[in-house]
């Protein structure tokens, strides 16, 4: 790996700053071999996957939907929850099977989900007969790629030799880590978005744009990544030759535009994706304070059952963490990272109520690098994180794996 550039005076203080400016590698384009740290991270990744599979097995036997059940059901059934059904329906039947669509009263609003993960699922299913196993395999492979990319990004930001391993550890033990092991789109998105960010810091702009475009096929968050990449490009371009890759930055918007065109051709609605979000998940625009108020009432005013109320409490906490992260990034002048996280918060924090913000934290790599810097500086902070995150990650995993709403 390239040697880190000399740090500025501010960075020579005993307390390393939050996300110091990353190094830029204009040299080699060939991927380096796996280091000892990479192998350690992959071992940790395998162990955390095994722990989640054990949890899933135990959940099906200890917490069945029917307390009198004598059969735990199919071994992969705990992973067939919630959004997985939408991805499966799109992959197996398409977006508008047999002429059905949003004009039907019982429509499931599946067009709210971008096509990247369902397309990958359909492709893998050609060689893996089980749809669920195919989805888990995608997330398993993508998650491994993602943690290796995260290790390399952490090395750019932090000088500590253990920075990459620590950052990956914090992500894999995070409260919502279960969603990296299920048939959801988070792992696949990270497997594309993190290498795109890494390529941008190496000024490999065509590669960064292609990877970001692929990430946009998976989640709308790819557009937030594209905005961060564009800002990073503007802030780092110095010479005329640096500006030549500028047209590539339009590429990540193409998948979203093509998807909107496809939906318009089938529904006559250019905003079909947004309207599906509104119908299925109450994502009509509301002022941020209105969304906070509604979420607070849902969490604490006893208007919902305790399980849903707890998850809304988690939504509020995740919003506070996100706002604090953006404030820190702005304070440290990490503008592209602040734009990426800020756009995510704006999209999730301006609907009727908060939904999926805890899950979105998985995609905020600046958060995990920031926490890694703090834990490397303070062993007590690391101990506190592990002790607090462990029960939360267990609760979220059990909640999801037993079929309850987990955000």
Locate each region found by the language model.
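Signature aromatic-anchored transmembrane alpha helix within multi-pass, membrane-resident enzymes
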Residues: 250-253, 377-407
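Transmembrane-helix signature of polytopic, membrane-embedded enzymes
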Residues: 130-134, 150-173, 335-339
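Membrane-interface alpha helices of multi-pass inner-membrane proteins
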Residues: 172, 179, 193-198, 206-233, ...
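Short hydrophobic/aromatic helix or loop-helix immediately within or flanking a transmembrane segment
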Residues: 81-97, 104-128, 288-297
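Short acidic/glycine- and proline-prone juxtamembrane loop motifs at membrane-interface regions
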Residues: 182-188, 357
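Transmembrane-helix motifs of polytopic, lipid-linked glycan transferases
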Residues: 123, 137-158, 324-325
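Loop-to-helix entry region of an early transmembrane alpha helix in multi-pass inner-membrane enzymes
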Residues: 105-106, 111, 115, 119, ...
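Membrane-lumen/periplasm interface segments of specific transmembrane helices
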Residues: 51-65, 226-322, 336-341
């Amino acid at each position: 790996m390239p040697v880190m550039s000399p740090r500025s005076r501010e960075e020579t203080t005993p307390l390393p700053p939050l996300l110091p400016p990353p190094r830029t590698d204009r040299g080699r384009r060939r991927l380096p071999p796996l280091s000892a740290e990479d192998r350690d991270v992959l071992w940790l990744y395998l162990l955390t996957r095994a722990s989640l599979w054990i949890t899933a097995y135990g959940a099906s036997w200890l917490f069945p939907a029917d307390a009198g059940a004598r059969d735990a059901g199919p071994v992969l059934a705990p992973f067939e929850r919630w959004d997985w059904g939408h991805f499966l329906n799109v992959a197996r039947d398409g977006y508008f099977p047999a002429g059905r669509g949003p004009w039907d009263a019982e429509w499931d609003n599946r067009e709210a989900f971008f096509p990247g993960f369902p397309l990958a699922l359909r492709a893998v299913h050609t060689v893996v007969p089980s749809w669920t196993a195919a989805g888990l395999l995608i997330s398993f492979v993508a998650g491994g790629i993602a943690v290796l990319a995260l290790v390399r990004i952490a090395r750019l930001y932090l000088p500590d030799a253990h920075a990459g391993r620590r950052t990956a550890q914090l992500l894999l033990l995070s409260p919502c880590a279960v969603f990296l092991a299920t048939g959801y789109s988070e792992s696949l998105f990270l497997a594309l978005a993190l290498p795109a960010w890494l390529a941008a810091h190496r000024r490999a702009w065509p590669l960064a744009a292609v990877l970001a475009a692929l990430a946009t096929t998976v989640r709308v968050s790819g557009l937030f990544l594209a905005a961060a990449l564009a800002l990073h490009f503007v802030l780092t371009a110095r010479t005329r030759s640096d500006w030549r890759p500028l047209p590539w930055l339009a590429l990540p918007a193409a998948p979203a535009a093509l998807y909107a065109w496809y939906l318009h051709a089938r529904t006559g609605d250019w905003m079909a994706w947004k309207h599906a979000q509104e119908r299925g998940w109450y994502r009509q625009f509301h002022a941020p304070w209105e969304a906070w108020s509604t979420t607070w009432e849902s969490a604490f005013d006893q208007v919902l059952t305790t399980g849903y109320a707890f998850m809304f409490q988690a939504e509020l906490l995740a919003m506070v963490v996100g706002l604090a992260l953006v404030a820190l990034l702005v304070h440290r002048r990490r503008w592209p990272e602040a734009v990426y996280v800020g756009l995510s918060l704006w999209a999730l924090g301006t609907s009727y109520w908060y939904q999926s913000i805890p899950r979105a934290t998985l995609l905020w790599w600046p958060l995990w690098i920031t926490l890694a810097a703090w834990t490397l500086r303070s062993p007590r902070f690391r101990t506190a994180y592990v002790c607090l995150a462990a029960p939360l990650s267990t609760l979220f995993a059990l909640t999801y794996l037993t079929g309850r709403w987990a955000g």
